[in-house]
């Protein structure tokens, strides 16, 4: 192709607008470049070095060729691998740059030279200099020459930027001092554009800075002393740029400084005062451009995040900037747009996140998390006082907004008094005349309901009336938003307390769901209906939903009709949220009320299958994600309906699992942009979608295993081929795929002729082992894997007991124990490293360090407890068959954990020690519970002493008392009549009585303390059942003992298992007409029975099929007591409102 034809081709690539013709032109261009590389390079170099209108465009295309091909292949192809040809081309480009006056032309030419310099210097710095001496000679001759234009100096610095991107070792070999001096000269240049180019060089160098400021002799890093000189000059230079109102160059310089603070904030440590002056100097004057203020806010937030001891160095300066600028900026919504806000479908995301408001919100979120409660909350209280004295709309908005933004960062240490202050402030603001302020109050309540839960919910008497009142706000956006806050608040509110407001909630839902066409009203009312499914009794929820289901189904019908008319339509976030809430509400109602919803389930699933086919313009795949979540809910409740929908679901999931979450950007060769480097993109939405897909699969495998069996082999192959279980960068995707692997054996057992259980076990177990051997650096991941393993162990062991197929039994058991031991070792190491890092973090004060260490130890404790669950699963699933490996494998684990507690106890008790003791005892409890007394006794006997000792009240570690009281109770239940237990009764009764008394007094109020209380109460009852004479002698007679116990039993509420145990005990006493219950203690017994059976756990008890005998016994008791005159009605009247409500529903159903 001759030069004229090539120039014409370039012109067409640059200007052609017709899509089809443009594609033809581009295809021709690519074909020419591939088939005639020598001609292509010769022509494009001619264009680059000419003065044609296409020269800059050609320079961009050629640089991309150089960068994307890896070895400057475009040039080398032209010379058939001859470096001299490359050299000639680059010298020509250099000479062309030296003769230019246009800044754009110089920029594009310098970028080509920069890429070339980077390539020849990165592997051999000194040899690379020899390959291109002309450049370094020109640099020395021209850069400092008085006649050199600022544009050319910028071009040279653009080239130097690429050299600075190499490791500092390479820079020093090239001539480090000369390059450093050159950058210093650029920073001091009179032209701001030159200074900006020099700052970009500093930014490239900063990647190799020494953040510890200790080792200045290591030539692989730039000493901080040099970097700090650079940064100091940048900070000095910026005010002059801004003073000249050269905001464009100042913005570029500030962007680079922000990057430096982000990558190596320690460099700024000696300049905190200078940065403070710079920040205030930019934020104070009103005439300074907002773009600079936005960047300055980011700079300040990075300063707070990345300088370890910033609070000690500059607490006063930080406080001033937060109070004077960050807080007020959090109220700067654009009031001129309020009318548009009122009609917006998405008022919650209406404000521009690129405004000062958006930047301030983001910065305050980071700052509050970094600086913490002790710095931020006092400033909030001061700002509230300031806003009260200066109650502008923006100040009032800022107050509520600040509470919202800082909630997560302050949650660790916030006190009840702080929450009261916060609620009272919000109550006052809730009456503000401006809609935006009232809306922000609701945003704050919604966020605080999550971050300060459950303490925040203890003030429901203040918050709930406010929310139900604001649901009737004259501004529909505010009224609708109140429902969102209600959903968050109710999520952590106790069921009994929710019932206090049920009558106020129903008209709110009716108004916003049935009587409003406002999108946000409909969306949030659907969410509120869904949230009440877990709170209300089924009958109450059914009564509510009878009116709502037809209306919600009508909503869904309208959505489907709209999508059918425009299957490729674009849906904004509010519309997507609305559809997702419909799907959520319908699937939850279907799951909660299967009989009521049964007529609608097939049409719903049919419509959901149709949703799979719509190509909605939604980059985040939100609608597909919500559809899959709805499917996962429905499969749990309607497994018999599901198999006929299996094929389209599996087909869609296969499409999802084939998606790539990482894509290399195919840069459009013909698009001219400032940032046009080749890169790759990770799509979190694909990862989320695949994680949800595995969640759906695991539900199908559990609920319809036989129907899934034909797909199992292909599914496991997909996991292996894509390495979801070993190589995924998404924790949830990895864990969900492992959960599916652990469920595979259940599928094989359900359909052994389709999927051979031994073969599936061999494959799935091998995959599980591979997953555990992949890189894991988080305690939580080990815990989650162990949680999935418990399910696998249960399914596998049940199969062994039913089939006696011992093919790989011993090998499997040994490997599980080996894996768990390795998990334990790895978690210990991670715990030690995490604690060491926290204790060495200078940015944390002692109280924060203690809190974070405690949280980390809690994670470790949860992991050890989960490992104990896996060990205990063997006992539960195998019973006495587990004896084969109990002594050689499990008992050493228990001994090791107990010994760790006892041997280190003299040095004080830590959370980790407690975890090992409680976990060891919980395994012993499983052995007692699931093995026969004859086989379990010898295993447990060596540990009885430590169990009994630790029923003694330990106020600091009451969870020890909880598990030991529970296990001691099991000993009396399983080994009833054993004379060795009788001698323990005085000690145990004294310990239980002390624990009960302390908790009852209110001295201990934690969840663990309340559970320990429940266990102590049932322990005393189990001792009385096993040894009634001994207990009667110690308690003033059995009648007196049971009278006292029944009063205590009525208050058992935390531990569901102990609630059930207490109910069973009372039922059995009624069944045998025990005089200790049926005579003088009848009222006590009935009150305790009603409080327990119709209390907080009533719903979960009656919906659990394993409790059929208990439910039948409870019905018998109520029938039996009905013949005792008015005693039942009188006793019910003394019970709580919630108990009365549940009892009333029970009687109405029975009638």
Swiss-Prot record:
Cellular compartments annotated: Nucleus intermembrane space; Cytoplasm; Nucleus
Q: Please give the start and end residues of each transmembrane region.
A: none
Q: What is this protein's name?
A: Importin beta
Gene Ontology, cellular component aspect: cytoplasm; nuclear envelope lumen; nucleus
**InterPro entries, sorted:** ARM-like (IPR011989), ARM-type_fold (IPR016024), HEAT (IPR000357), Importin_beta (IPR040122)
One example of a Gene Ontology biological process annotation: positive regulation of gene expression
Main function: Functions in nuclear protein import as nuclear transport receptor. Involved in encystation process. Constitutive expression enhances cyst production and increases transcription of endogenous genes involved in encystation. Level of mRNA of the transcriptional factor myb1-like protein increases in early stages of the encystation process followed by increased mRNAs of the cyst wall proteins cwp1-3.
Q: Does Calcium count among this protein's keywords?
A: no
Q: Which Gene3D superfamilies match?
A: Leucine-rich Repeat Variant (1.25.10.10)
- Main localization, broad class: nucleus
The entry's keywords: Cytoplasm, Nucleus, Protein transport, Repeat, Transport
The HEAT repeats lie at 1-36, 37-82, 83-132, 133-175, 176-222, 223-269, 270-316, 317-377, 378-416, 417-453, 454-495, 496-540, 541-593, 594-642, 643-704, 705-756, 757-811, 812-880, 881-932, 933-978, 979-1027, 1028-1074, 1075-1120, 1121-1151
Give the record's family classification.
Belongs to the importin beta family.
* Domain comment as written in the entry: Lacks the importin beta N-terminal (IBN) domain.
Q: Which GO terms describe its molecular function?
A: nuclear import signal receptor activity; nuclear localization sequence binding
């Amino acid at each position: 192709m001759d030069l004229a034809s090539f120039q014409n081709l370039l012109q067409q690539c640059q200007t052609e607008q017709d899509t089809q013709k443009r594609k033809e032109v581009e295809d021709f261009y690519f074909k020419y470049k591939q088939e005639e590389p020598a001609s292509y390079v010769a022509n494009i170099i001619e264009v680059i070095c000419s003065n044609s209108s296409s020269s800059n465009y050609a320079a961009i295309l050629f640089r991309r060729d150089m960068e994307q091909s890896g070895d400057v292949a475009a040039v080398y192809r032209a010379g058939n691998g001859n470096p001299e040809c490359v050299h000639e081309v680059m010298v020509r480009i250099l000479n062309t740059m030296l003769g230019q006056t246009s800044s754009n032309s110089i920029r594009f030419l310098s970028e080509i030279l920069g890429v070339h310099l980077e390539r020849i210097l990165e592997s051999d710095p000194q040899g690379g200099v020899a390959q291109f001496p002309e450049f370094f000679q020109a640099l020395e001759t021209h850069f400092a020459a008085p006649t050199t234009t600022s544009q050319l100096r910028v071009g040279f610095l653009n080239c130097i930027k690429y050299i600075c991107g190499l490791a500092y070792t390479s820079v020093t070999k090239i001539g480090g001092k000369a390059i450093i001096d050159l950058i210093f000269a650029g920073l001091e240049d009179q032209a701001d554009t030159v200074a900006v180019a020099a700052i970009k060089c500093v930014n490239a160098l900063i990647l190799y800075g020494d953040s510890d400021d200790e080792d200045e002799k290591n030539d692989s890093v730039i000493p901080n002393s040099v970097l700090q000189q650079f940064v100091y000059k940048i900070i000095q230079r910026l005010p002059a740029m801004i003073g000249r109102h050269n905001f464009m160059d100042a913005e570029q310089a500030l962007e680079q400084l922000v990057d430096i603070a982000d990558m190596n904030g320690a460099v700024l440590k000696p300049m905190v005062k200078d940065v403070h002056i710079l920040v205030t100097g930019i934020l104070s004057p009103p005439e300074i451009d907002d773009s600079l203020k936005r960047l300055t806010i980011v700079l300040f937030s990075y300063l707070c995040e990345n300088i370890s001891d910033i609070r000690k160095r500059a607490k006063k300066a930080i406080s001033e900037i937060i109070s004077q600028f960050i807080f007020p900026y959090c109220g700067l919504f654009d009031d001129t747009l309020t009318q548009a806000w009122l009609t917006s479908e998405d008022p919650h995301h209406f404000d521009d996140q690129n405004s000062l408001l958006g930047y301030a919100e983001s910065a305050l979120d980071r700052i509050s998390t970094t600086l913490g409660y002790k710095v931020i909350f006092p400033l909030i209280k001061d700002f509230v006082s300031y806003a009260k004295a200066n109650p502008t709309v923006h100040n009032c908005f800022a107050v509520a907004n600040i509470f919202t933004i800082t909630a997560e960062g302050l949650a660790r240490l916030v006190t009840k008094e702080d929450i009261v202050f916060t609620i009272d402030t919000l109550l006052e603001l809730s009456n503000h005349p401006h809609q935006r302020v009232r809306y922000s109050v609701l945003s704050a309540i919604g966020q605080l309901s999550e971050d300060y839960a459950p303490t925040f919910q203890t003030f429901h008497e203040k918050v709930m009336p406010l929310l139900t009142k604001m649901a009737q706000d004259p501004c529909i956006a505010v009224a609708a938003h109140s429902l969102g806050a209600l959903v968050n608040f109710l999520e952590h509110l106790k069921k009994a307390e929710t019932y206090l407001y049920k009558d106020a909630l129903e008209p709110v839902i009716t108004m916003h769901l049935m009587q409003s066409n406002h999108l946000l009203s409909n969306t949030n009312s659907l969410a509120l209906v869904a949230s009440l499914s877990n709170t209300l009794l089924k009958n109450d929820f059914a009564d509510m939903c009878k009116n709502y289901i037809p209306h919600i189904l009508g909503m869904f019908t309208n959505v489907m009709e709209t999508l059918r008319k425009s299957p490729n339509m674009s849906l904004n976030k509010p519309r997507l949220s609305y559809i997702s809430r419909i799907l959520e509400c319908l699937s939850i109602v279907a799951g909660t009320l299967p009989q009521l919803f049964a007529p609608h389930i097939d049409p719903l699933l049919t419509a959901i299958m149709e949703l799979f086919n719509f190509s909605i313009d939604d980059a985040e795949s939100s609608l597909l994600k919500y559809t899959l979540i709805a499917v996962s809910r429905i499969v749990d409740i309607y497994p018999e309906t599901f198999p006929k929908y299996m094929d389209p679901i599996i087909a869609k999931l296969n499409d999802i699992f084939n998606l790539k979450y990482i894509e290399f950007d195919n840069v459009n060769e013909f698009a001219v942009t400032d940032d046009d480097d080749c890169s790759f993109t990770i799509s979190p939405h694909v990862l989320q979608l695949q994680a949800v897909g595995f969640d759906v699969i695991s539900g199908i495998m559990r609920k319809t295993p036989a129907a899934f069996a034909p797909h199992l082999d292909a599914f496991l192959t997909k996991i292996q081929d894509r390495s979801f279980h070993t190589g995924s960068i998404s924790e949830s995707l990895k864990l969900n795929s492992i959960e599916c692997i652990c469920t595979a054996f259940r599928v094989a057992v359900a359909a052994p002729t389709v999927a051979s259980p031994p073969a599936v076990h061999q494959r799935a177990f091998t995959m599980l082992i591979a997953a555990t051997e992949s890189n894991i650096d988080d305690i939580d991941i080990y815990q989650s894997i162990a949680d999935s393993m418990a399910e696998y162990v249960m399914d596998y062991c049940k199969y062994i007991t039913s089939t006696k197929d011992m093919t790989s039994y011993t090998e499997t058991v040994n490997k599980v124990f080996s894996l768990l031991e390795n998990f334990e070792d790895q978690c210990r190491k991670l715990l030690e490293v995490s604690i060491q890092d926290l204790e060495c973090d200078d940015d944390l004060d002692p109280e924060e360090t203690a809190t974070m260490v405690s949280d980390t130890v809690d994670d470790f404790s949860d992991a050890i407890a989960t490992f104990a669950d896996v060990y205990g699963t063997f006992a539960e699933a195998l019973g006495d068959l587990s004896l084969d490996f109990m002594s050689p494998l499990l008992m050493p684990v228990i001994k090791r954990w107990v010994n760790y507690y006892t041997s280190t106890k003299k040095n004080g008790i830590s959370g980790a020690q407690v975890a090992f003791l409680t976990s060891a005892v919980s395994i012993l409890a499983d052995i007692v519970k699931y093995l026969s007394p004859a086989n379990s006794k010898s295993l447990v006997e060596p540990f009885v002493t430590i169990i009994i000792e630790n029923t003694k009240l330990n106020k600091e570690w009451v969870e020890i008392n909880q598990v030991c009281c529970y296990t001691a109770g099991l000993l009396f239940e399983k080994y009833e009549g054993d004379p060795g237990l009788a001698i323990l009764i005085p000690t145990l009764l004294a310990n239980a009585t002390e624990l009960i008394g302390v908790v009852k007094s209110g001295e201990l109020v934690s969840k663990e303390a309340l559970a320990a209380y429940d266990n102590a109460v049932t322990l005393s009852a189990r001792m009385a059942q096993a040894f009634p004479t001994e207990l009667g002698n110690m308690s003033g007679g059995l009648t007196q003992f049971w009278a006292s116990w029944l009063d205590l039993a009525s208050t058992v509420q935390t531990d569901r298992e102990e609630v059930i145990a207490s109910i069973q005990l009372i039922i059995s006493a009624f069944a045998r007409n025990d005089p200790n219950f049926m005579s003088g203690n009848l009222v006590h017994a009935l009150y305790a029975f009603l409080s327990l059976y119709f209390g907080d756990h009533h719903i979960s008890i009656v919906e659990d099929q394993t409790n059929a005998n208990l439910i039948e016994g409870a019905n018998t008791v109520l029938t039996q007591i009905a013949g005792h005159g008015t005693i039942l009605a009188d006793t019910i009247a003394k019970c709580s409102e919630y108990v009365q409500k549940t009892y009333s529903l029970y009687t109405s159903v029975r009638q």
